Design a protein with these regions (language model features):
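Acidic/proline-rich low-complexity IDRs
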Residues: 13, 44, 51, 65-68, ...
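Ampiphathic alpha-helical segments that act as solvent-exposed interaction surfaces
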Residues: 79-145
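Amphipathic, interaction-prone secondary-structure segments
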Residues: 30-86
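Acidic-enriched, low-complexity/disordered segments with a strong bias for Aspartate over Glutamate
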Residues: 6, 16, 28, 59, ...
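Residue-identity detector for threonine
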Residues: 12, 39, 49, 61, ...
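Charge-rich, low-complexity N-terminal segments
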Residues: 1-44
Length: 145
């Protein structure tokens, strides 16, 4: 049980790093090159022509007893829940599936399929780099902030 709680804290820390919870404000927000959206189980970073989604699947499976984290890179605009479908749906250009490290001996709490391990900061940086790479493939997307 303690490990599941530790993993949930790591997920929350990653989501807070990538897309902090919004505070209600009276003024209208100005558009930025990358919009950040939180979902109940993840977040979406949306640029003009590229996006990155992070989704946490906490239910245990035989291969992932502590759950799985999916990082997906998209070309286009990802439809948000409740929004009408887009004429041109976004397409997946890359995916990274990570598992929590059981009993980590250091700060690394995530392991990719290729064995690469990440702590929260390095995984957030990797996510932003993946989004920047996809945005660079379409210069109209603008820089990652």
């Amino acid at each position: 049980m303690k490990e599941k709680n530790d993993v949930q804290r790591a997920v929350t820390a990653l989501l807070d790093e990538l897309a902090p919870e919004r505070v209600l404000k009276r003024a209208e927000r100005l558009p930025v090159p990358v919009e950040q959206y939180r979902t109940p189980s993840g977040c979406v970073l949306q640029a003009a022509t590229a996006a990155l989604s992070v989704s946490w699947f906490p239910d245990p499976t035989a291969d992932a007893p502590l759950g799985e984290l999916h990082v997906i890179v998209w070309r286009g605009v990802v439809s948000r829940r409740g929004a009408p479908p887009r004429r041109e749906p976004a397409t997946v250009t890359g995916e990274l599936v990570l598992l929590p490290v059981e009993h980590p001996s250091d700060a690394s709490v995530w392991r990719a399929g290729d064995g690469t391990t990440y702590d929260t900061d390095s995984l957030a940086a990797r996510c932003l780099a993946l989004l920047a790479e996809q945005m660079a493939a379409d210069p109209a997307a603008g820089p990652v902030k």
